């Protein structure tokens, strides 16, 4: 499903990853030694970038060997998607009787498809996360120390990909304690990912006199919106979780009996409408200063219903089974959700991606013990539901690709303008727009060092990131073009 998007332009944070990868191709030992303007001022990457370098090294390897064309890089990123899919299926075979349903419910989500079309770290994290989980569970099932050792290595590679990989250590520990009858000395293996994290941090400190792990805390403290309440973050998190696991939300008609479906739908829709209405009265916490239209409130309520279903599934699982696998999935979902809502700097699909396979497996496990009167009819319903979810997810991914294309087209248009303009043309903004403006040879505006002269132009995209207002005391303050990057 990702193949149609291999020509997708560089988008969102892809631009930073590609820029760092090109630097690594020239100087791999000093991987974060370049300066990059990502918030309006050029700063060394090691001062602000909040993730380990593994994915950038992978991009550098691919770009050096095969070139930096978008289709080359996106083709290379099919590998982590394949690994994540294989690991999800391997784990689902151990945890449920319908592994193909769990796999399809994972793949047919907007979270998986959109993340799979990016050049960022999230699909690689999911691949190593799922490999670590699958090999750890398989190792205990077989009593194999080799599987457990490979799981520990994958956990370390997850940590080298994104620091969220540290969540694997407590999850694997809890599962091992619940399965503590065999094999022995498993705890020694969990020192492997810990040692890999320490080694990565030690190298960054000796190279830059700076622990990269501390950047995570700085980003959260500097960027997180502080005037939102715990309740508001919960609403946002539930709505995002519902959208990320759209396939499982659609399966609700199969997973619950008629009375529960009716009762749950009425209850959660009523609560959702009430909560969204109350929250929409506060123009700061949820709506960013604008009033939500009725249609948006309805969609928001549906997403809240889907997000709430995750915890209904978790409760049902623990009530009926409460085996080590149930606790593993429950803690996996709860921990990821808490991290995405209350730890990371903003609630986003990328942070919630790791819980998608766990939710899909919970849904498949529920199908294992519910009474099915007509199995063939139920299977047809499941196939239909997952097909609809796949179509919706592909349409969302297509819209995201069109947004990326619009940024590239705008950059090329303003690049042509810069070549014919007599003064100097600068630009603000980041993401893919920044990448293609650099390709077009347009200078980036730096709030600290740029001095504007009469006749200069500053291009300011209104719906981009970190676009700073031009001070009125600048000579050329009135000679700037503000525009919105949007679909045609």
Per-segment meaning from a language model:
Residues 379-457, 462:
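Membrane-embedded, lumen/periplasm-facing catalytic core of multi-pass transferases
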Residues 53-60, 65-86, 115, 119, ...:
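Loop-to-helix entry region of an early transmembrane alpha helix in multi-pass inner-membrane enzymes
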Residues 93-96, 132-148, 158, 180, ...:
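Membrane-interface transmembrane helices that cradle and orient dolichyl/undecaprenyl
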Residues 88-110, 126-127, 142, 146, ...:
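Transmembrane-helix signature of polytopic, membrane-embedded enzymes
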Residues 191-194, 198, 261-273, 293-336, ...:
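Signature aromatic-anchored transmembrane alpha helix within multi-pass, membrane-resident enzymes
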Residues 11, 117-125, 348:
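Short acidic/glycine- and proline-prone juxtamembrane loop motifs at membrane-interface regions
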Residues 75-99, 131, 135:
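Transmembrane-helix motifs of polytopic, lipid-linked glycan transferases
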Residues 185-285, 392-405:
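Membrane-lumen/periplasm interface segments of specific transmembrane helices
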